[in-house]
């Protein structure tokens, strides 16, 4: 099986290692791990700029944790893979709410307060409250709710119909 995309590499990484250092970009870390799968990366280096670590918690899933070991958020999963970063951010989940985090630092940049959220594209994302996820077993989609478009800082650009 060939692992070409960043999310496929993240899946491989999570399967192979329970935690990892966020000292390089995630992409650089995935490449490093693919080059040497036996390499052991420590979670938090003393001089690291980064404040978070990915950790696979058995029977709970993949979490981003802080230096104290607190669960901060979970990456949002789409099509059975962690969400890919777009426009410098990726979707996150805190409880049942969706927000966005910076792809390089892991810092939350838009609070997890939405029930539904599409990835950013060209600097904006459609997000909704009061919407619900429906599925046919293979595909899923959101229905209902109030939707708005936001910029990468979380500011409302326009009200919108469901995308």
What is each model feature region?
Residues 2-11:
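Bacterial N-terminal signal peptides that target proteins for export
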Residues 24-163:
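Residue-level detector of conserved, function-critical positions
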Residues 2-3, 18-21:
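Position-driven detector of the extreme protein N-terminus
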Residues 11-19:
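Bacterial N-terminal signal peptides
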């Amino acid at each position: 099986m060939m692992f070409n995309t960043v999310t496929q590499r993240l899946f491989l990484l999570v399967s192979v290692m329970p935690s990892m250092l966020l000292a390089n970009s995630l992409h650089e870390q995935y490449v490093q791990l693919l080059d040497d799968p036996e390499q052991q990366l420590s979670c938090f280096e003393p001089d690291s700029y980064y404040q978070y670590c990915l950790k696979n918690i058995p029977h709970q899933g993949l979490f981003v944790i802080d230096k104290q070991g607190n669960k901060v958020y979970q990456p949002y999963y789409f099509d059975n893979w962690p969400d890919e970063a777009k426009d410098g951010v990726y979707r996150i989940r805190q409880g049942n709410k969706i927000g966005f985090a910076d792809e390089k630092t892991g810092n939350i940049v838009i609070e997890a307060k939405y029930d539904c959220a599409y990835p950013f594209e060209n600097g904006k994302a459609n997000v909704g409250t009061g919407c619900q996820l429906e599925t046919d077993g293979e595909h899923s989609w959101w229905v209902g709710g109030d939707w708005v478009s936001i910029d990468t800082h979380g500011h409302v650009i326009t009200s919108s119909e469901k995308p």
